[in-house]
């Protein structure tokens, strides 16, 4: 499958140490199968960083080969309570120690504007079922691909657009 990473610069080599904590699936390298959604992220990143140009980097990923080679892959086929609790667990984690042991996680994107709802869930004011609805991405049904270990990153082959 062809995957895209949107940023303010071309990604030639993936450096997991540059990844930020507190993301949906943890600290790692994120990609999207939809180039339009990846470009939206590139625009946001360039605007937020106030430098560079919105840029897509493209990678080829063979999920079957990664699975055959024994990588630990978690797939959330749709929004679910398990997915919501996984997102909360990762967004709460502010340590360098990952909250899970998966090499790769594939699943829906959570809406970035719901930090308040996550806090309300943690405090017990929202049910997990309500949280699932609140976390649903408000655009097209979007999936993200998380690569969280050096071994996982080895399965991404950079290709020119």
Question: For each predicted feature, which ranges?
Answer:
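Glycine-rich loop/turn
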Residues: 1-29, 37-47, 83
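Ordered hydrophobic segments in well-structured contexts
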Residues: 1-5, 29-30, 56-58, 144-146
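Conserved NAD+-utilizing ADP-ribose enzyme module
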Residues: 23-24, 39-40, 44-161
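N-terminal cationic and glycine-rich segments that engage phosphates or anionic surfaces
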Residues: 34
């Amino acid at each position: 499958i062809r995957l895209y990473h949107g940023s303010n610069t071309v990604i030639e080599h993936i450096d997991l140490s540059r990844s930020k904590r507190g993301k949906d699936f943890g600290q790692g390298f994120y990609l999207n199968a939809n180039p339009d959604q990846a470009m939206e992220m590139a625009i946001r990143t360039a605007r937020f960083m106030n430098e560079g140009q919105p840029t897509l980097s493209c990678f080829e990923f063979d999920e079957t080969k990664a699975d055959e080679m024994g990588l630990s892959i978690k797939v959330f086929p749709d929004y679910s309570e398990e997915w919501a609790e996984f997102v909360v667990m990762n967004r709460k984690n502010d340590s360098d120690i990952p909250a899970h042991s998966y090499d790769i996680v594939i699943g829906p994107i959570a809406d970035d504007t719901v930090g308040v709802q996550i806090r309300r869930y943690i405090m017990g004011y929202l049910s997990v079922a309500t949280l699932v609805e609140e976390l649903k991405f408000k655009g097209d049904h979007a999936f993200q691909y998380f690569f969280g270990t050096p071994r996982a990153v080895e399965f991404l082959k950079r290709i020119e657009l």
